[in-house]
Amino acid sequence: MPKFVFVTGGVVSSIGKGIVAASLGRLLKSRGYNVSILKLDPYLNVDPGTMSPFQHGEVFVTEDGAETDLDLGHYERFTDTALSRLNSVTTGSIYQSVINKERRGDYDGGTVQVIPHITQEIRERIHRVGANSNADVVITEIGGTVGDIESLPFLEAIREFKGDVGKKDIAYIHVTLLPFIGTSGELKTKPTQHSVKELRSIGIQPDLLICRSDRPINDNLKNKISGFCGVNNEAVIPALDADSIYSVPLALKAEGLCKEVLEFLDLTDHECNLEKWQELVHKLRNPGPSVKVAVVGKYVQLNDAYLSVVEALRHACIENDASLDLHWICAEKIEEEGSNDLLTGMDAIVVPGGFGSRGVDGKIAAIQWAREQRVPFLGLCLGMQCAVIEWARNLAGLKEATSFELDQSTPHPVIHLLPEQQDVVDLGGTMRLGVYPCRLQAETMGQKLYGEQVVYERHRHRYEFNNAYRNLFIESGYTISGTSPDGRLVELIELKGHPFFTACQYHPEFLSRPGKPHPLFKGLIAAAQSRLPRSPQEALKQTQINSPNQSKNNP
């Protein structure tokens, strides 16, 4: 049976529980332990698939097609472990399962209640991860903040969980905040004390405290927290604000987090191997020349909507010894002001995924600009569909061409609905989701970047390239460099004669890892680097042509 670690959070939301869980996973894996991490989300949605990116941020897609919280992306990237739909649990999915069981008569006419039925379902979900993941340690992050009404069933479930396993098979970690009060010139422990008191009132005594702070925590404060909160002094772990999320595992290792957890779980503290991770952080802190990358999107007001895209760009920059100079460009602003003013000076352009018509014309204009100005371009999902529409309108003479999603009366639906989607009514969980194979055409840029003939990529879409336009597309100078194995679905396209112009129907950002960047992102950054000035004179010239009004954030 695996060991179980539960991570809760107090005082404020967005305190970093996900990064703590992912970092602990990385530290345990560096000692030879298999780890699986799951997230318990307290919202009533069955999954985040139908939620607005402005409310929830990115929807991360697992190999088996689950639409999950963005924290699962952190878990996968830090542990380099593929997770499944078992690793994402919401209040909505719990209630849905319990109600379905009640309708089937599984409860033999009993009164169905939060306790024991809801909490039992939650516990079963956690045990299921342990039984199906081959993990030595299962880490569970509980979403929300201690004290929230929504989180109470989950907290009660993990309290009950202690009765399911042995005393040495479970550990509770509480992430809290030590705010600095400028007028008094000191860090305050009272919010942490009250948060732990709230957790204790539920019946959970934390074994370790991760104390977030923007400045060092001295021994006197640690002793005070230890005394008031009932934890060992060594179990009060400072977690100072970090320059990068990838430096957090190293910082927590230095503070003894993994050693304390292993001691609580009665596991051997094997030799830790973090050499590659340390090299990664060193390269991140000591980058080469910067590359300006514009992300042209429709949800740029909330950067978390494109979290995996940003991390994939960062991984590629680390690998290529480059510094990422990221510019958020609102697609609708391009519609108002034009591409030239907003994109001049960019070394690469990424057009990520999305849904609906808002901002699409701005994305298409950005793609046209990248094509004509020979600026490296990478399109993802909707970004590929926009690249096809741009081709049809500007190179094939099909002025009214668009996607069937955007205009069902268009005479030229160069992007149309997948056949299997024709009769789909529900929105949630019904797209083409999860991993599918892609066969690459030999001697194409895509095949050279991957170095493989067949690759497996994660998808999330309802619409596809319309094969009625395939021959015209190829005759116009484009190459279809990747398709489904049967050749029916267009997965990857590229433009001949362009330094780097490629787009894919899938989401390569979900497979990028620190130290193992995705080939398409790595290729994009390499192409961007080829544009960098090679001499002081060229650098001056590049500075002069950059727009003086260029902003890093154009919401």
Swiss-Prot record:
<protein>
    <recommendedName>
        <fullName>CTP synthase</fullName>
        <ecNumber>6.3.4.2</ecNumber>
    </recommendedName>
</protein>
<feature type="domain" description="Glutamine amidotransferase type-1">
    <location>
        <begin position="292"/>
        <end position="534"/>
    </location>
</feature>
<keyword id="KW-0547">Nucleotide-binding</keyword>
<feature type="binding site">
    <location>
        <begin position="188"/>
        <end position="193"/>
    </location>
    <ligand>
        <name>UTP</name>
    </ligand>
</feature>
<feature type="binding site">
    <location>
        <position position="141"/>
    </location>
    <ligand>
        <name>Mg(2+)</name>
    </ligand>
</feature>
<dbReference type="InterPro" id="IPR027417">
    <property type="entry name" value="P-loop_NTPase"/>
</dbReference>
<feature type="active site">
    <location>
        <position position="507"/>
    </location>
</feature>
<feature type="binding site">
    <location>
        <begin position="14"/>
        <end position="19"/>
    </location>
    <ligand>
        <name>ATP</name>
    </ligand>
</feature>
<feature type="binding site">
    <location>
        <position position="405"/>
    </location>
    <ligand>
        <name>L-glutamine</name>
    </ligand>
</feature>
<dbReference type="InterPro" id="IPR004468">
    <property type="entry name" value="CTP_synthase"/>
</dbReference>
<feature type="binding site">
    <location>
        <begin position="148"/>
        <end position="150"/>
    </location>
    <ligand>
        <name>CTP</name>
    </ligand>
</feature>
<dbReference type="InterPro" id="IPR017926">
    <property type="entry name" value="GATASE"/>
</dbReference>
<keyword id="KW-0436">Ligase</keyword>
<comment type="similarity">
    <text>Belongs to the CTP synthase family.</text>
</comment>
<feature type="binding site">
    <location>
        <begin position="382"/>
        <end position="385"/>
    </location>
    <ligand>
        <name>L-glutamine</name>
    </ligand>
</feature>
<dbReference type="Pfam" id="PF06418">
    <property type="entry name" value="CTP_synth_N"/>
</dbReference>
<feature type="region of interest" description="Disordered">
    <location>
        <begin position="532"/>
        <end position="555"/>
    </location>
</feature>
<feature type="binding site">
    <location>
        <position position="462"/>
    </location>
    <ligand>
        <name>L-glutamine</name>
    </ligand>
</feature>
<dbReference type="GO" id="GO:0019856">
    <property type="term" value="P:pyrimidine nucleobase biosynthetic process"/>
</dbReference>
<feature type="binding site">
    <location>
        <position position="354"/>
    </location>
    <ligand>
        <name>L-glutamine</name>
    </ligand>
</feature>
<feature type="binding site">
    <location>
        <position position="71"/>
    </location>
    <ligand>
        <name>ATP</name>
    </ligand>
</feature>
<dbReference type="InterPro" id="IPR029062">
    <property type="entry name" value="Class_I_gatase-like"/>
</dbReference>
<keyword id="KW-0067">ATP-binding</keyword>
<feature type="binding site">
    <location>
        <begin position="188"/>
        <end position="193"/>
    </location>
    <ligand>
        <name>CTP</name>
    </ligand>
</feature>
<feature type="compositionally biased region" description="Polar residues">
    <location>
        <begin position="540"/>
        <end position="555"/>
    </location>
</feature>
<dbReference type="GO" id="GO:0005524">
    <property type="term" value="F:ATP binding"/>
</dbReference>
<feature type="active site" description="Nucleophile; for glutamine hydrolysis">
    <location>
        <position position="381"/>
    </location>
</feature>
<feature type="binding site">
    <location>
        <position position="13"/>
    </location>
    <ligand>
        <name>CTP</name>
    </ligand>
</feature>
<feature type="binding site">
    <location>
        <position position="71"/>
    </location>
    <ligand>
        <name>Mg(2+)</name>
    </ligand>
</feature>
<keyword id="KW-0479">Metal-binding</keyword>
<comment type="function">
    <text>Catalyzes the ATP-dependent amination of UTP to CTP with either L-glutamine or ammonia as the source of nitrogen. Regulates intracellular CTP levels through interactions with the four ribonucleotide triphosphates.</text>
</comment>
<dbReference type="GO" id="GO:0046872">
    <property type="term" value="F:metal ion binding"/>
</dbReference>
<feature type="binding site">
    <location>
        <position position="224"/>
    </location>
    <ligand>
        <name>UTP</name>
    </ligand>
</feature>
<keyword id="KW-0665">Pyrimidine biosynthesis</keyword>
<comment type="pathway">
    <text>Pyrimidine metabolism; CTP biosynthesis via de novo pathway; CTP from UDP: step 2/2.</text>
</comment>
<dbReference type="Pfam" id="PF00117">
    <property type="entry name" value="GATase"/>
</dbReference>
<feature type="active site">
    <location>
        <position position="509"/>
    </location>
</feature>
<dbReference type="GO" id="GO:0003883">
    <property type="term" value="F:CTP synthase activity"/>
</dbReference>
<dbReference type="GO" id="GO:0042802">
    <property type="term" value="F:identical protein binding"/>
</dbReference>
<feature type="region of interest" description="Amidoligase domain">
    <location>
        <begin position="1"/>
        <end position="267"/>
    </location>
</feature>
<dbReference type="InterPro" id="IPR033828">
    <property type="entry name" value="GATase1_CTP_Synthase"/>
</dbReference>
<dbReference type="InterPro" id="IPR017456">
    <property type="entry name" value="CTP_synthase_N"/>
</dbReference>
